[in-house]
Amino acid sequence: NVIEQSIRKSISTELDSNSKKIGISLSSGIDSTLVLALLRKEFPSTDIESVSVKFSESIDETDISKKISEKFDTNHHILEIDNFLEELPKAISIVKQPFWDLHWYYLVKKMKNLTNVFLSGDGGDELFGGYTFRYKKFLELTNENSNTKEKIISYLNCHERDWVPDQELIFGNEYKFNWEEIYQILEPYFNNSLSNLTQVFLADYNGKLLHNMQPLYSSI
């Protein structure tokens, strides 16, 4: 399996075979579970510290992550966060950008007391096409006759859960938001001969993966 071999090679290349402990961010999803499974194959006798984050008033899947941790014999930790906004200023001061996803902050804070090396499954959706609900909506909003701008607008409309509805109130009048600039950034990914769905994969990879996750994990 090419994907399995590639991930295992990446794990073995990045990690020291003499590592006494390795950490992993473990959700209940396929991506982090796959990384953990292959990590255990590469390091069958190494102590693995797995960490899951549980935010109050959001869907709790930590019971599933606990079962996964038991299957792959990890030392599992569950972080329960009641007020996730409490340390927002500290989190933003680290990455210098207003990221809304704060699970990484609490993961790193916990991991630094466990090990200096940790892995996650972040980026799997962008690499392997995990946002099926978005793809379905995009294909419903577009067709083979849709022009570049129409496809870009449809693509953005598939990300409504990521929008900040009151951004002017939050960022103030000095924040000059311009839709045309957004369209220009995305234009290369939708103005080409690829199929509509492949264009979405291209935009996902060059957008969130390269300009969100990569800078984030480089900062921490």
Task: Tell what function each PLM region has.
Residues 1-200, 216-220:
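ATP-dependent adenylate-handling active sites, centered on carboxylate activation for C-N bond formation
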Residues 205-219:
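Short Ser/Thr-interspersed hydrophobic loop/turn segments at strand-loop and sheet-helix junctions
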